[in-house]
Amino acid sequence: MFARRLLCSAMIAAGLAAAAHADARDLMVVGFGGGFQDNARKHLFQGYTRANGAAVKDDVYNGEMAKIVAMVKARDVTWDVVMVEAPELVRGCEDGTFEKLDWNVINRSKFVGGGTVACGAGAVGWGVTLFYDQKRIADGPKNYAELWDTKKFPGKRSFRYTPKTTLEIALMADGVPFHDVYKVLATKAGQDRAFTALDRIKGDIVWWRSGAQPLQFVASGEVAYAVGFVGRTARAAGEGAAYPLLWPTLLYSFDYWAVVKGSPNTAEAMKLINYMTEPAPLLALAQDWAVSPATKAVADDPAVRARNPGMVANHAEVGLSISTEFWVEYGEDLEKRFNAWAAR
């Protein structure tokens, strides 16, 4: 009897150990790709491994929440830390897609104002602006109203395939001042106005879904004008491309690091986020890539600011801050309407 119990206990222990081993995996960080992630891999992900011994892998997505929601509902979470835009973060925090962050592990005091929310720690500031190739077009549109003038400025235009930023741009093109955009867009009449404005140039629109595409489209001549990520445009300009940074067309926000609800690596993920938002690794990253960090000591560093002409914080006063509150409230309905409109 004793031997049988001993054998049974050993089998249970072995089974538990095997299950634990099956559940154990490397940390998985998922971001938006591009030059930032290439350099984050070296300085943040691999830096964490060097400092703490935990292996970190990374992958890329385009911001779609459906996959994250599905893995949470299925309780089969294969992503641990994700870079998320602000409205999606807040909605995901409210509906249980993301974990509340542990501020005993993550030092909340190191961030700029607005750099943290319950489920997110600020990663980087980002923005989009209008640009074009001055080697092909010496004098292009300087604002969104001019971008809508297809007679004066013929050619294809490229926008990100999303209602966020696209609807704001449409209203500004239609004459709505920056400071009134969200007041107007919060009304049915304002939403109709934005889609009507888009109707006027729909035949000239080429949509992009990854951050590299607008640069590729403009470089190849497939489109004449594009609204693309500031960091990528500034980087291309620094490497010799004749792309102007038209700051009066700036729309900007923060991306955040979040932990997927149900991650088996939740505790380690909190430590990773704290590391990735520390000044030292971010300053090292800034040596290789122009960043707009949400960590105050880095954002305020004169050398970082001088090295990054595309730092959105330097130009926020002339741009439009993308309203997280607006997109949390109206985003789901406008996404459905936008997708239906684009498919027609």
What are these regions (language model features)?
Residues 34-41, 78-79, 84-216:
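Extracytoplasmic ligand-binding site segments that recognize negatively charged/polar headgroups
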Residues 316-344:
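Conserved C-terminal helix/tail region of periplasmic/extracytoplasmic solute-binding proteins
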Residues 129-136, 171-173, 254-268, 284, ...:
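A bilobed periplasmic-binding-protein/Venus flytrap-type ligand-binding module shared by bacterial periplasmic
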Residues 76-83, 207-208, 224-229, 244:
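Paired acidic/hydrophobic, glycine-rich loop segments that form the ligand-binding mouth/hinge
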Residues 23-92:
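Early extracytoplasmic/lumenal segment of secretory-pathway proteins
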Residues 260-319:
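Mature extracytoplasmic/periplasmic domains
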Residues 87-91, 225-242:
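A ligand-binding cleft/hinge motif common to bilobed small-molecule-binding domains
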Residues 108-111, 126-128, 191-192, 196-200, ...:
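Periplasmic-binding protein-like
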